[in-house]
């Protein structure tokens, strides 16, 4: 019986070594993980989702944008500020920058790089008072009063006709900075 037990133990040890070698570890290159961010000395930190957001304006009939100054229905969006200290700054304003239509310095021009882009229309952003923002990279929006913690600064975007619009893709980009006072 002892001999049978010893034989089984030796056999188990030998087969365990073979099984281990059969499932050898393989390592391959996987890729790169990029980390992006910024440490700021400011009253608040811009929320990651606000730093690179897309506002969906949807489809608007060109008949609704037939004359200079006509607007689509507004679509709300916000710039969220986190970890705010009202003791550091009591107010925040947003400074937008972007390419504008020559005759309308408060209307973003569309990215007309693709065939089939809309014409005679741009995008206007309104601040929380309904005032159109400038896109010169210098002029700040109306001040927003900060509270401690999280703050959402509300805006609205509209399509803005600069003449009789024609249908097509109507996309634009703007960058922003936050000014604390």
Swiss-Prot record:
It comes from the Bacteria. GO terms for biological process: cell adhesion involved in single-species biofilm formation. This is S-fimbrial protein subunit SfaA. Fimbriae (also called pili), polar filaments radiating from the surface of the bacterium to a length of 0.5-1.5 micrometers and numbering 100-300 per cell, enable bacteria to colonize the epithelium of specific host organs. This protein belongs to the group of SfA (S-fimbrial adhesins), which are associated with uropathogenic strains and with strains causing newborn meningitis. It comes from Escherichia coli O6:K15:H31 (strain 536 / UPEC). Disruption phenotype: Deletion leads to loss of fimbriation and a decrease of hemagglutination. Keywords: Disulfide bond, Fimbrium, Signal. Its main location: other. Disulfide bonds join 44-84. Pfam families: Fimbrial. The gene is sfaA.
């Amino acid at each position: 019986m002892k001999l049978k037990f010893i034989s089984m133990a030796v056999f188990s040890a030998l087969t365990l070594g073979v099984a281990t070698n059969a499932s050898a570890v393989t390592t391959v290159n996987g890729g790169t993980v990029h980390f992006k961010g910024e440490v700021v000395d400011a009253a608040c930190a811009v929320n990651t989702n606000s730093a690179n957001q897309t506002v969906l304006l949807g489809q608007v009939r060109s008949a609704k944008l037939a004359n200079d100054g006509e607007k689509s229905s507004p679509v709300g969006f916000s710039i969220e500020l986190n970890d705010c200290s009202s003791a550091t700054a009591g107010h925040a304003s947003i400074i937008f920058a972007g390419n504008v239509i020559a005759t309308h310095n408060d209307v973003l021009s569309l990215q007309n790089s693709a065939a089939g882009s809309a014409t005679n229309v741009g995008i206007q952003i309104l601040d929380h008072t309904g005032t159109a923002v400038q896109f010169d990279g210098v002029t700040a929006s109306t001040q927003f009063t900060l509270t401690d913690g999280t703050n959402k600064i509300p805006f609205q975007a509209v399509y803005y006709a600069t003449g009789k619009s024609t249908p097509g893709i109507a996309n634009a980009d703007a960058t922003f900075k936050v000014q604390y006072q």
